[in-house]
């Protein structure tokens, strides 16, 4: 009850009494994952990360979880239908009543259209799609220093967010790893694929007057401040 009151007061105090539903778009290393956590806490909305959702369904040991695990372990991509079904289940959950924050979804124009239909069927109005823009040189520096704890999905950075003990997860003490594709040449290929897939998604949201661009070259706190200002402005326009 105390948590609910604090959440209600925060939303009332800052004039955000309505639902806030957002999509975050950005390449790996753009900082959207870091900002997603801050946004979800700030507005008390449901953070839907496809990576977290897929890890959870695998951990459940269900028939679907075993199917997803086989796909991911073989290096395949989980189908749009499976991802959208899992997203739909989360959308309907009570903890998402204040709004939704989509992180890592949609990744293709087909997913964007499916998400649009999912929200429309539930009479949910997407407030905005936030695109994280940053210089390629900064992106390379961020990506190539990343460290991961595979079991939990926690991430660190050798320069910007190092673990307490080098190459060791702060919580479990497990060994951290570099992703094999977090190297300059592999990164170029990933960004080429990202740009190819994201262009129609950006056009899709821009045609709906929902696309807002974020200068992700700035530090974490300034980026978060800019996001809050954009959300305030967009909410005012929607009234």
Swiss-Prot record:
Q: What is this protein called?
A: Adenylate kinase 2
Annotated region (NMP), positions in chain: 49-78
Which GO biological process annotations does it have? Answer: adenine metabolic process; ADP biosynthetic process; AMP phosphorylation; purine ribonucleoside salvage
Source organism of the structure:
Schistosoma mansoni
Q: What class of enzyme is it?
A: transferase
The ranges of region (LID) come to 145-182
Q: Which GO terms describe its cellular component?
A: cytoplasm; cytosol
Write out the entry's keywords from A to Z: ATP-binding, Cytoplasm, Kinase, Nucleotide biosynthesis, Nucleotide-binding, Purine salvage, Transferase
Q: Where does ATP bind?
A: 29-34, 146, 155-156
């Amino acid at each position: 009850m105390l948590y609910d009151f604090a959440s209600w007061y925060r939303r009332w105090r800052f004039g955000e009494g309505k639902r806030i539903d957002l999509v975050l778009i950005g390449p790996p290393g753009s900082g959207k994952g870091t900002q997603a956590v801050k946004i979800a806490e700030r507005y008390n909305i449901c953070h839907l990360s496809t990576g977290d959702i897929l890890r959870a369904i695998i951990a459940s040991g269900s028939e679907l979880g075993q199917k997803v695990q086989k796909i991911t372990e073989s290096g395949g991509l989980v189908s749009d239908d499976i991802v959208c079904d899992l997203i739909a289940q989360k959308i309907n959950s009570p903890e998402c009543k204040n709004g939704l924050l989509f992180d890592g979804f949609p990744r293709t124009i087909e997913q964007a259209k499916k998400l649009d239909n999912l929200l429309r069927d539930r009479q949910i109005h997407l407030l905005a799609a936030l695109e994280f823009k940053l210089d390629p040189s900064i992106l390379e520096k961020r990506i190539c220093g990343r460290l991961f704890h595979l079991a939990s999905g926690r991430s660190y950075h050798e320069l910007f967010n190092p673990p307490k003990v080098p190459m060791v997860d702060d919580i479990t003490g497990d060994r951290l790893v570099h992703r094999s594709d977090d190297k300059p040449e592999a990164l170029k290929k990933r960004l080429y694929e990202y740009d190819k897939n994201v262009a129609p998604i950006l056009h899709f949201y821009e045609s709906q007057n929902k696309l807002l661009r974020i200068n992700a070259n700035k530090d974490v706190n300034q980026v978060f401040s800019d996001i809050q200002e954009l959300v305030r402005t967009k909410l005012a326009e929607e009234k």
